[in-house]
Structure formats: structure tokens, C-alpha cells
Curated annotation (Swiss-Prot):
Protein name from the UniProt record: Imidazole glycerol phosphate synthase subunit HisF
One Pfam family of this chain: His_biosynth
Keywords, alphabetical: Amino-acid biosynthesis, Cytoplasm, Histidine biosynthesis, Lyase
Natural source organism: Pectobacterium carotovorum subsp. carotovorum (strain PC1)
Function: IGPS catalyzes the conversion of PRFAR and glutamine to IGP, AICAR and glutamate. The HisF subunit catalyzes the cyclization activity that produces IGP and AICAR from PRFAR using the ammonia provided by the HisH subunit.
Gene: hisF
Gene3D superfamilies, sorted: Aldolase class I
Amino acid sequence: MLAKRIIPCLDVRNGQVVKGVQFRNHEIIGDIVPLAQRYAQEGADELVFYDITASSDGRVVDKSWVSRVAEVIDIPFCVAGGIKSVEEAGQILSFGADKISINSPALADPELITRLADRYGVQCIVVGIDTWHDATTGRYHVNQYTGDEARTKVTTWETLDWVEEVQKRGAGEIVLNMMNQDGVRNGYDLHQLNLVRDVCNVPLIASGGAGTMEHFLDAFQTAHVDGALAASVFHKQIINIGELKQYLKQQGVEIRVC
């Protein structure tokens, strides 16, 4: 069995790490490189960096910090933000990223997933999905351009359909960003994760809602995800990654402990 992964998420805007609640009202957390170093030292399995306004601003991720991160950490990291071409992805990988993630650009051009997978291999192509639960209809819908709340829009895709579509096109991994849960720290949406797990045959990463160590355990044992991504509990030092991994190991979760 592959070890489960603990993945800190660093949302980047204007060269700094920020964090919002339900993708709104972002506050500055700190500088990118020191945070990346701290998480690597604490025992993170990998890091994810989202340049959150790149797609809504119509630009590609700022590559200046990618190489600086690559110089100081020795764990894999994934970069996302406005990547719309094979060439742009190649640049980011050449700067030292191990994976690239696409979200809004894939919704605008689904064939981009296939072009990237064909060129670089499915193992380094991640598709991020920003999913919103509509309490009125009970349905889960995919949102686009979520880095800017003024430009965020609901797409015509329902979440489960989009999960199946991106796999057909070559996604090697899916990060499910559950917007309703984001930043509120009351647990991952296990019901939604189980629905997605049933149709997802590639590694699935849960994102949005972690507030306690038990929430990570629930995601692994109840929803059978491959990795759990979190931000605010790590940024605010509510949970230490090393202690979290020791707890999960004690609960029988297969996990890499430093």
C-alpha cells in the first residue's frame, strides 16, 4: 500500500502566502520560501503552491519564486496558476517543480490536459477542481476563476462528471477543493469525497476543512483518499505536521514518519 500524503497548501498572491475562508477575504500569512522550508523540515510529504489570481488576471504563475523554492527544499512540490500551454508548463518544470496543476485553464480548454499528459507524462499532471455544494439543489458544481471572488463563476459542469472527464483526458491526480469547507476547519466533506472516490481511479487529494487531527484520519479511513491537503491549520500552527503523522501512524494509517 502506498503511504498516505500530508500536503500543506500555500496560496500565493503578489509574492506572498495568503489564506482566505471559502476562497474570500484573504489575509497575508508570510513569505513563500521560509514557509516552504518550515513545512519540509516538519515532515510534509509534498507542497502545493497556487498562484491564486493568475488565471483570473490572465497571466501565468510568477516563476521567480519557483526556482528559489526548489533550491531550499528536498521534497516534491506542485505549482498551479494560469498555465495554459505545454510551453508554460515546461518552463515551470524546468525551474524545479515536480508537478504542475491546472484548474480554470482546463475548464476553458479541456484538451490542454491531454496535451500536457502526452508531453510530460500523467504522473506530473494534476487537475484541481473547485467544487461548491448547492444546498438548494443538493448538487455539486465546478467553479472557475475562484482566485478572484469578483470573477468567480459557476460552470455548467457538475463535479462528478468533470472528475470523470479529466481522467479520460489524462489527469494523473485530482485535488478536490471543497469550497464550502475551505478555511472553516470543521472537517472535510466526507460525503462528497466518497462520491468522488467511487468514480476516481487516480490518486485523490482532499482539500478544504481540516481543523483537527481526527479530520485527517476521517479523510483517510472513511473516504480513502490518497492525500490530505490543508493550509490554515499549518499556517497558524494549530497542527504540527510531525505530530500529525505520529498520530495517524498510531491509528493504523500507512504514512511516512521522519
